[in-house]
């Protein structure tokens, strides 16, 4: 099976650090900034991993309690990433479904105020978007690291 890497050229490289593995920070981030209403027991098992497949351009991928799959991207330029949004969302949905997660939340962190409207418009026009697939465009300062 061939692996396809999407958008690696447009993503800033971030060093892994201890805060990414701090369950309390991740729980706060997911609940307060992504609007997740999962019960407390879901947050007892959180893994933060660097992906080597299609999500290699993600800064971090969280797998939370066997229910929630969150891919966090911090692009150098969200416009470069916008061209790959459809493939990334589709890959996230497939990963969610193959691994039995209830939700896929794609997070794009950028300082650009135009990103929310631009990315939301592209996301809303994608075929097959369901109520278990979410896009969050946030400021990098809200990330849990």
Task: Give the ranges of each region predicted by the language model.
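A generic structural signal for short, non-catalytic loop/turn and secondary-structure boundary residues
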Residues: 64, 99, 128-130
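Amphipathic protein-protein interaction modules
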Residues: 74-126
